[in-house]
Curated annotation (Swiss-Prot):
Protein name: Receptor-type tyrosine-protein phosphatase-like N
Taxonomic lineage of the native organism: Eukaryota, Metazoa, Chordata, Craniata, Vertebrata
Species the sequence originates in: Rattus norvegicus (Rat)
Region span, RESP18 homology domain: 41-137
PANTHER family documented for this protein: IA-2 PROTEIN TYROSINE PHOSPHATASE, ISOFORM C (PTHR46106), RECEPTOR-TYPE TYROSINE-PROTEIN PHOSPHATASE-LIKE N (PTHR46106:SF1)
Sequence ranges of Low complexity compositional bias: 652-681
Length: 983
């Protein structure tokens, strides 16, 4: 988005904003500017903001900020950028930034364009006369012109004694043009070498924030640390004559980040330190072409192994043979060098004889750089005038356009070796000239050669193949889990690896990223480490590398780079066979676990179906197998044959109802099992014989139909839930004085069906208690009293209800505490006696019948009337609050014990759980239905029975599971009675 034009813009000099210095600068620029204003000026700064150029323009590299031009056919401006120029531009940018201006502002564009006009320009390159295509530029001018004809005006003994530079093997000689990088760097270098020394300039500081976006986009770092490190590496190379480190291929980055000067008006030239850096740039821009030839393996050295040398490290191999071509004569090379040196010095009006030996030595070292890099342009070249629009990011990624080597046939068994990725090539130090390269015909026998290393060491090699056949290049690789792997992350990984193997980061060359892997090569180093050694060390320190980089290293090794830029692994160190085996075992265990879980689920489902079938088979003849059917039919025949022997219970005289509880327990015929018995007998007492077998058959068929037809059971339960009792008011229970006596507000007694206490005997002077009488058939005699678990302040009311109703049996269906929630308060003493209002309760005994229930005996006394009674509490322990017991057998056995104690009583049974609804209603429903069947009732309707009891207390049997449990319990009891019939 373009910012609005500010008052201090080009329209005038009287803006109210900004400092006085900036306004004065703008006024001076306006007075000295062109009449056309800034409308005709192309935008500057597209390297920092790509939005400055329209879709019809491209951003070209001008060595500073980038300039928008319409099309790529125009010549690139050649600016003679020096340190004073950079200092001037830096000050202007700082002033513009302090005013809050951006590249989009017209004032910024106008000021920058005026400053760019003041920078000296170099003449555009002219095509070389010998170049047919004319695509290779040649720089002309007094500082950079190379003359290919004529002899030097003179020669001095110092010149004759200088060592001659070698040829590059490609025919680059007298007429070799300079690259754009050389053309820009040679003039200030020569000026420094030939002119008198200047006083040292004060060091200037450069603020990276001014070019922070550019540094971040190109270097992958916001502080530009990589560029500065590279520049310092070049200076160190020139000082120590060591191997150069990787350097940026962009001239503008290094110049903008490192140039310094005195002032804009002082054009005496850059500082000596800067010239050394520029010479490092010039050196790094060179690239030695790699001819196609076979790589010779090195003979084993003492104490070391034989390692294959890298053919791209710039080391030339010398092949000796009887039919080889001889190198050019040394005299011809000397003439060529002297001609080139004289041509360069002629532009300065200096002759060779006027130079000192030190100056000649320095110039000769610089001259050795001139033939290299022929026809190459930093930042990418325009081939054949192709109209291709490139952004600066694409140019910086491509860098130097690599020469495509024609495919050559390889030896049998060797893969094709060609590299399609852009790589940074390293060359020899200029202090160690390369031997001339010769060719060898086919069929030559292997001979020992002396190959010069960068450190000047002589290393024997064996050449056994023709030099015209190159072999595949070997690369070290590290495969990570990040795909694609960024170049910044790959370089960081190699820097950390260099620290672990005690190498410098400059030892890694030809760094590139292929998918999740980073590939590299190793130059000669002091540790004499090869690619295999470095990759092996990377595998050993894999954990440290992963911890420091955050990447997971999957594989390391050495391989050959193919045309697809893929790496053929030769040696793997990342994943050990033990780890692979462990991962395989874990995967197999997971699959086996899934299969086992599936099998268990299927078995459980099959077992559930089988259990249902067995239950149906046990309930009636239709669902039973053949043996059960025959047994059932035989049972029916025996029952019909002996029917006269069994009379109905109505014809028999009822036993006396005045026997006490103590007599029941003292009767020897009815003695209970041992107190420590854990599994009570199922048929402990004889089943009653007054059930008609036809009635039992009808009941079993009814239960079987319910168990088979789940939909019918669901519909029946829905109808029960929709049933509403009439009347159903609970005004008394909701009264102000009675609401606190209720444990659960949803389960209250109806006004027409509630237990009323005597007010004169009640400690609270109220007749209310949360209890409901449940009538079976006689309204004058309720069979049950359904009540809630007593609260701490209603225990006295509970014992008053027990005393006034004459109850002798209490059925408790809940534990005192369940899952940390109190279900009922203890209303009896732990031991001894306790007084509740006027009722004294003594604990006589506590009989643990089994793990599911226990029996307690109490002695109850009214201290006012001195009357005493005995009563029994049956406490069932294994019934969860929101569910049902795991089996019906413990509850049915519990019911038998209760009825055995209650037999012959005319008083109601007090049944309570926590809320007096769910478990209480389920027990009452089961007991009422079974009692009716025992009395010989022909028709049984369990749903109608539940509606009958719900008319007297709401919420009895709270869930469908409890209703189904009641049906199952009734069916089990009927089946037990039929099995107990005499044979």
């Amino acid at each position: 988005m373009r910012r609005p034009r500010r008052p201090g813009g080009p329209a005038g000099c009287g803006g109210s904003e900004g400092s006085g210095g900036l306004r004065l600068l703008v006024c001076l620029l306006l007075l000295s500017g062109r009449p056309g204003g800034c409308s005709a000026i192309s935008a500057h700064g597209c390297l920092f903001d790509r939005r400055l150029c329209s879709h019809l323009e491209v951003c070209i590299q001008d060595g500073l900020f980038g300039q928008c031009q319409a099309g790529v056919g125009q010549a690139r401006p050649l600016l003679q950028v020096t340190s004073p120029v950079l200092q001037r531009l830096q000050g202007v940018l700082r002033q513009l930034m302090s005013q809050g201006l951006s590249w989009h502002d017209d004032l910024t564009q106008y000021v920058i364009s005026q400053e760019m006009e003041r920078i000296p320009r170099l003449r555009p390159p002219e095509p070389h006369p010998r170049d047919r295509s004319g695509s290779v530029p040649r720089r002309a001018g007094p500082a950079g012109e190379l003359l290919s004809q004529g002899n030097p005006t003179g020669s001095s003994p110092a010149v004759q004694g200088l060592s001659r530079p070698p040829g590059d093997g490609n025919g680059a000689g007298v007429g070799s043009p300079l690259s754009s990088l050389q053309a820009e760097l040679l003039p200030p270098l020569l000026e420094h070498l030939l002119m008198p020394p200047q006083p040292p300039h004060p060091s200037l500081t450069y603020e990276p924030a001014l070019l922070q976006p550019y540094l971040f986009q190109q270097f992958g770092s916001r502080d530009g640390s990589r560029g500065s490190e590279s520049a310092s590496g070049v200076v160190g190379h020139l000082a120590k004559a060591e191997d150069p480190v990787l350097f940026s291929r962009s001239l503008s980055k290094a110049i903008l980040g490192t140039h310094s000067g005195h002032s804009f008006g002082d054009l005496t030239g850059p500082s000596p330190a800067q010239l050394f850096q520029d010479s490092g740039l010039l050196y790094m821009a060179q690239e030695l072409p790699v001819p196609g030839r076979a790589r010779a393996p090195r003979l084993p050295e003492e104490g070391g192994s034989s390692r294959a040398e890298d053919s791209s490290e710039g080391h030339e191999e010398e092949v000796l043979g009887g039919h080889g071509e001889k190198s050019p004569p040394q005299a011809v090379q000397a003439d060529v060098s002297l001609q080139r040196l004289a041509a360069v010095l002629a532009g300065y009006g200096v002759e060779l004889r006027q130079l000192t030996p030190e100056q000649l030595s320095t110039l000769l070292t610089l001259l050795q750089l001139l033939p290299k890099g022929t026809g190459r342009h930093l930042g990418g070249a325009v081939n054949g005038g192709a109209d291709v629009k490139k952004t600066i990011e694409e140019q910086m990624q491509r860098g130097d356009t690599a020469d495509a080597r024609p495919p050559t046939p390889l030896l049998p068994g060797h893969p094709t070796a060609s590299s399609t990725s852009i790589k940074v090539r390293q060359v020899l130090s200029p202090g160690f000239p390369e031997p001339p390269k010769t060719s060898s015909p086919l069929g030559i026998s292997a001979v020992l050669l002396e190959k010069k290393s960068p450190l000047g060491q002589s290393q024997p090699t064996v050449v056994g193949q023709p030099s015209a056949r190159p072999s595949a290049e070997e690369y070290g690789y590290i495969v990570t889990d990040q795909k694609p792997l960024s170049l910044v992350a790959g370089v960081k990984l190699l820097e950390i690896l260099a620290e672990h193997v005690h190498m410098t980061s400059g030892s890694f060359i030809n760094i590139s990223v292929v998918g999740p892997a980073v590939t590299f090569r190793i130059r000669h180093n002091e540790q004499n480490l090869s690619l295999a050694d470095v990759t092996q060390q990377a595998g050993l320190v894999k954990s440290e590398l992963e911890a420091q980089t955050g990447l997971q290293i999957l594989q390391t090794g050495v391989g050959q780079r193919e045309e697809s830029a893929a790496v053929l692994p030769r040696q793997a160190h990342g994943i050990s066979p033990m780890r692979s085996l462990l991962l395989t075992l874990v995967a197999l265990a997971g699959v086996a676990g899934l299969l086992v879980a599936l099998a268990v689920a299927l078995c459980m489902r099959h077992h559930s179906k089988q259990r249902d079938k067995e239950r149906l088979a046990a309930l009636g003849p239709e669902g039973a197998h053949g043996d059960t059917t025959f047994e059932y039919q035989d049972l029916c025949r025996q029952h019909m044959a002996t029917k006269s022997l069994f009379n109905r219970a109505e014809g028999q005289p009822e036993p006396s109802r005045v026997s006490s509880v103590s007599s029941q327990f003292s009767d020897a015929a009815q003695a209970s099992p041992s107190s420590h018995s854990s599994t009570p007998s199922w048929c402990e007492e004889p089943a009653q014989a007054n059930m008609d077998i036809s009635t039992g058959h009808m009941i079993l068929a009814y239960m079987e139909d319910h168990l088979r037809n789940r939909d019918r059971l669901a519909k029946e339960w829905q109808a029960l839930c929709a049933y509403q009792a009439e009347p159903n008011t609970c005004a008394t229970a909701q009264g102000e004085g009675n609401i606190k006596k209720n444990r659960h507000p949803d389960f209250l007694p109806y006004d027409h069906a509630r237990i009323k206490l005597k007010v004169e005997s009640s400690p609270s002077r109220s007749d209310y208690i949360n209890a409901s009488p449940i009538i079976e058939h006689d309204p004058r005699m309720p069979a049950y009293i359904a009540t809630q678990g007593p609260l701490s302040h209603t225990i006295a009311d509970f014992w008053q209800m027990v005393w006034e109703s004459g109850c002798t049996v209490i059925v408790m269906l809940t534990p005192l505490v369940e899952d940390g929630v109190k279900q009922c308060d203890r209303y009896w003493p732990d031991e001894g006696s306790s007084l509740y209002h006027v009722y004294e309760v003594n604990l006589v005994s506590e009989h643990i019948w089994c793990e599911d229930f226990l029996v307690r005996s109490f002695y109850l006394k009214n201290v006012q009337t001195q009357e005493t009674r005995t009563l029994t509490q049956f406490h069932f322990l294994s019934w969860p609050a929101e569910g049902t017991p795991a089996s019906t057998r413990p509850l049915l056995d519990f019911r038998r014990k209760v009825n055995k104690c209650y037999r012959g009583r005319s008083c109601p049974i007090i049944v309570h759980c926590s809320d007096g609804a769910g478990r209480t209603g389920t027990y009452i429903l089961i007991d009422m239905v079974l009692n009716r069947m025992a009395k010989g009732v022909k028709e049984i309707d369990i749903a109608a029975t539940l509606e009958h009891v719900r008319d007297q207390r709401p919420g009895l049997v709270r869930s469908k599971d409890q209703f189904e449990f009641a049906l199952t319990a009734v069916a089990e009891e009927v089946n037990a009675i039929l099995k107990a019939l005499p044979q």
